[in-house]
């Protein structure tokens, strides 16, 4: 399960809509409890370095990722996942999403995927990569009004 405030989710949506018709991406910052549930406390936008296929691929800027990692290294918060958009496609994990997650062995992370249809958010789902079969499975995405 992943939870975040409605305000944070709205800010992520704003990023995805502003980036349309290209994919955008960013990192989710927060905490993980003993049951492996994530709580997002912040996020950081990351540049999409993919100039050739930006409409259906993202290549997260490694410097942006590293900046986010360093910003929170002496805090109780850490990178707990990634978000990205799917312009004019469903909010389901694609084979490319799966292949990349397996490549970096990101089994403990949540992946929020936002479907943006004709410039407006249509849906959002969160996914977790299973270590046992290298497939994404949907996890509950909960928003809380007062969790920011």
Please report, for each region that a protein language model flagged, where it lies by residue:
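Conserved beta-strand-loop surface patch within small alpha/beta domains used
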Residues: 1-79, 88-148
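Residue-level "edge-of-site" marker
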Residues: 85
């Amino acid at each position: 399960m992943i939870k975040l405030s409605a305000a944070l989710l709205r800010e992520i949506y704003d990023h995805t809509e502003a980036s349309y018709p290209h994919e955008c991406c960013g990192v989710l910052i927060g905490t993980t409890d003993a049951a492996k549930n994530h709580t997002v406390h912040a996020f950081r936008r990351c540049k999409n370095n993919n100039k050739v296929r930006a409409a259906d691929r993202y290549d997260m800027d490694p410097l942006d990722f590293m900046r986010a990692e360093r910003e929170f290294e002496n805090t109780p918060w850490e990178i707990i996942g990634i978000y990205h958009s799917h312009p004019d496609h469903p909010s389901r994990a694609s084979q490319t999403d799966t292949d990349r997650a397996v490549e970096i062995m990101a089994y403990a992370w949540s992946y929020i995927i936002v479907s943006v249809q004709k410039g407006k958010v249509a849906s959002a789902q969160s996914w977790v990569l299973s270590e046992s079969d290298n497939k994404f499975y949907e996890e509950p995405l909960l928003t809380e009004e007062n969790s920011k």
